Amino acid sequence: MQRNMLRAKLHRATVTQADLDYEGSCGIDEDLLDAADMREYEKIELYNVNNGERFSTYIIKGKRGSGEISLNGAAARRAHVGDLLIICTYAPMNEEEVASYKPKVVLLGEGNKIKAIKET
């Protein structure tokens, strides 16, 4: 049996830009992608801490070191600049993988700077 497990999470990312007219996606600072082991075009689930909205889109690379978290296209309707997001990826795993697996959690602070990286 396969289970869909949390693979990686950017916790409390601050939205820096929302552009309704841009092709859909979520731009994420490349440093944050590396820290969370997330990849461009990977599907992500986003949870808005401010308003409870839950939605999905895919990643595009943002400028390295910029702290960018940009919501584009339809996703821009789900959050405002300054809102806090939890950004997650999931992966199917079998029972053997689940038994020893730990997701990577990147805790973010002001300016989307990395505060800590945990493998819970």
UniProtKB/Swiss-Prot annotation:
Residue numbers carrying Pyruvic acid (Ser): 25
Post-translational changes noted in the entry: Is synthesized initially as an inactive proenzyme, which is activated by self-cleavage at a specific serine bond to produce a beta-subunit with a hydroxyl group at its C-terminus and an alpha-subunit with a pyruvoyl group at its N-terminus.
UniProt-listed Pfam families: Asp_decarbox
Pathway info: Cofactor biosynthesis; (R)-pantothenate biosynthesis; beta-alanine from L-aspartate: step 1/1
Positions with a binding annotation for substrate: 57, 73-75
Keywords: Autocatalytic cleavage, Cytoplasm, Decarboxylase, Lyase, Pantothenate biosynthesis, Pyruvate, Schiff base, Zymogen
The keyword Ribonucleoprotein is assigned to this record: no
Stored NCBIfam families: panD
Known function: Catalyzes the pyruvoyl-dependent decarboxylation of aspartate to produce beta-alanine.
Similarity annotation: Belongs to the PanD family.
Subunit architecture: Heterooctamer of four alpha and four beta subunits.
Protein name per its UniProtKB record: Aspartate 1-decarboxylase
Gene transcribed to yield this protein: panD
